[in-house]
Each structure stands twice: as structure tokens, then as C-alpha cells.
């Protein structure tokens, strides 16, 4: 399934009061074009500085602040790898349920795309080992 298809399918099933957060990277940037909100403070965006690993901790904070509101986070496998240690935080006590969508393509996709564009398909260090 392509990221656009995943975003559309998930968006179709989202409740109106959901809080979402996306990380940085190609998969999440695609989704930014599909979200619409009727109320403020429903989208936690990483901003322009590229804080890789932002998506997961931000929905944890949103769930603590609004425990009765559903939260959904989106990240690529590389970005999630940076923040997955936060899983130990939410496992320490009884936490309300969250949803985290992880797009798996086994690469630092944005970096790979940029290096292939700028350096004539010469890239290194952008592949993630699926093992």
C-alpha cells in the first residue's frame, strides 16, 4: 500500500475529535496534504526544523493532556527508531491506548531522495537493514 492510500484509508476512519501528529520524512509529508480539522489544536506538527522522532512522543503527551480524546501518530521506520525508547515510558504504568502508524520502507527516505537528486543517484547510509 502506498502512503497516500494509507493516509486516505486512515483518515476515512478517524473520529472528528482525533488529535494527530506526524513525524518528518516523505511518508508523513505526503499526509500533511490530506488532513483537515474543524477545531484548533488537533494537529501536532514537527515544524520546519526537522526534529526527527517527534511523532511518537508528541502523541504520548497529547494523550496525557487529553486522556479521553483519541490520538494517532504517524512516522516512518527511521524516525520511529529514534523515539521508540519512549515505549518504556508508557509501559511503566497503566496508560490509555494510543495508535501509532509506522510506514516501513527500510530507508531514510527523504535523505535518500535528496542524495539521489543532488548527487546523480550516488547515495550511502540511507538504507535500513530489515533484519
Residue ranges and their predicted role:
Residues 30-131:
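Thiamine diphosphate
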